[in-house]
Amino acid sequence: MFMNRWLFSTNHKDIGTLYLLFGAWAGMVGTGLSLLIRAELGQPGTLIGDDQVYNVLVTAHAFVMIFFMVMPIMIGGFGNWLVPLMIGAPDMAFPRMNNMSFWLLPPSFLLLMASSMIEAGAGTGWTVYPPLAGNLAHAGASVDLTIFSLHLAGVSSILGAINFITTIINMKPPAMTQYQTPLFVWSVLVTAVLLLLSLPVLAAGITMLLTDRNLNTTFFDPAGGGDPILYQHLFWFFGHPEVYILILPGFGMISHIVTYYSGKKEPFGYMGMVWAMVSIGFLGFIVWAHHMFTVGMDVDTRAYFTSATMIIAIPTGVKVFSWLATLHGGNIKWSPALMWALGFIFLFTVGGLTGIVLANSSLDIVLHDTYYVVAHFHYVLSMGAVFAIMGGFVHWFPLFSGYTLNTTWAKIHFMIMFVGVNLTFFPQHFLGLSGMPRRYSDYPDAYTTWNTISSMGSFISLTAVMLMIFIIWEAFTSKREVLAVDLTSTNLEWLNGCPPPYHTFEEPAFVNPKWS
């Protein structure tokens, strides 16, 4: 029974739960790696003593957080749980493929961990640029294992993307049009399209790197007529859509949370929100070289990538102001989930502003590979994606479990986390503007103050993570069951009870078409 339910599952709710648990576990591994990084940088001088090991930590931290925490939780966890419920589908379109998508991740994670256990580990940074990732600078199997790990995670995501696209387009009730689906469903659809189009390019790039390393090809080796810059183009053609893949489901969740706790029955500017997400998805594919302003591109190429990058601020602004307009005049309920959403809107906007700074190629040439870039993307990830995940979790936890969280503890948790992440990452803007480079285990004494403060902030965030574990334990032991849910007519996922039955629909859902 246990094996049939959890190993061979074809149920979107169980698979979603598996994704959430796996993501939470990987998230703690990733947090541990980040704390080791911050411990090393907490004061001048060495702690770990080996710069290769330091770079392995940085590389693993990025891979674990991106591929094994944010994506499994947002797309696999919330996506699997909510998309079928929100469109009235009995399950996903391909339930067994859904199971395989999940079970490809633990082996992938194992390969990534194994890569750091053998030889010297993969100390390449998450970008895995040759020639550093070539077979001279990284002899041994570490980078090869990392590449295989990425292949598995990529196949998992591609299959998941096919599943979500098919489910969302094909499994709505006949009377429901695409423009009647909730914004979270739209966000998962756009995300799935991005995954489907970008991951094959990454697979091509890392496969070429694999053959360069093992089969004497020279795709990225100038000695044989190759070009290492080609790898950067292939990687970032995936890498930039990837960062939008990480944030788009968060946009969808924030739209739901803001609407719900404003007491509104719909978000402000539904169509604008949909097309903003589609625009962001499209533009995300034509700005990749802004990660490469320092490789020596023509001035006209840099002018194009600068302006194209800035255009993304427009649909993003549409979303931010629509969230604020949704809040306007609402009957605001100050729940923990809304606090996460408001924190998301503010801090994501700050991260977006530093992104506008970095979009200027002339400025980026100075700021590239400094802590200013680290501060920028951690504001949009550590305070964008993670705040969206936390907000979504405290909002939908009663749906998933049937139990309610202690709201006082949940609010305290938010406040500790808010202080922690800001104390960690705000000083890094100053470090970057003063020229402190990324991916170094040590630094001149002049940078000590801000690094010490940053490391203190990371330990405050650790306290918040541990408090969250306690809060979840408290909810499951106290067993406060859900009494009533507001606004179910426009929040269909709550309509079948908390938690919903194992099989939501024993017969096709009926949607009255009169409103369309």
Swiss-Prot record:
Heme a3 binds at H376. Cu cation binds at H240, H290, H291. The chain crosses the membrane at residues 12-40, 51-86, 95-117, 141-170, 183-212, 228-261, 270-286, 299-327, 336-357, 371-400, 407-433, 447-478. It catalyses: 4 Fe(II)-[cytochrome c] + O2 + 8 H(+)(in) = 4 Fe(III)-[cytochrome c] + 2 H2O + 4 H(+)(out). It comes from the Eukaryota. Component of the cytochrome c oxidase (complex IV, CIV), a multisubunit enzyme composed of 14 subunits. The complex is composed of a catalytic core of 3 subunits MT-CO1, MT-CO2 and MT-CO3, encoded in the mitochondrial DNA, and 11 supernumerary subunits COX4I, COX5A, COX5B, COX6A, COX6B, COX6C, COX7A, COX7B, COX7C, COX8 and NDUFA4, which are encoded in the nuclear genome. This is Cytochrome c oxidase subunit 1. It comes from Balaenoptera physalus (Fin whale). The gene is MT-CO1.
